[in-house]
């Protein structure tokens, strides 16, 4: 049973956050991702985020993790085209 009703939307919010907060040069840490999810009323644990990100990758999202100076950063590298790009 989900911890909250919004829990079912967690994967969608993760994609939304990655689309809005990252690009090919700038990533987001798991701590930052947790804070962003909390803003949407979704509680999550670091361990579950690893699994969620892996599920999104298996589904076809081009999510890359990179080790930075002190942290590990996740970013959504390739995206759908924006209307302006067409």
Language model regions located:
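Short, basic/aromatic recognition patches that contact phosphate-bearing ligands
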Residues: 1-86
């Amino acid at each position: 049973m989900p911890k909250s009703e919004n829990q079912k939307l967690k994967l969608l919010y993760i994609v939304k956050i990655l689309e809005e907060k990252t690009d090919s040069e700038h990533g987001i840490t798991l701590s930052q991702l947790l804070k962003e999810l909390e803003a949407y009323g979704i509680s999550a644990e670091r361990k579950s985020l690893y699994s969620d990100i892996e599920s999104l990758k298996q589904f076809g999202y081009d999510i890359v993790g990179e080790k930075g100076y002190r942290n590990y950063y996740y970013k959504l590298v390739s995206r759908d085209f924006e209307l302006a790009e067409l």
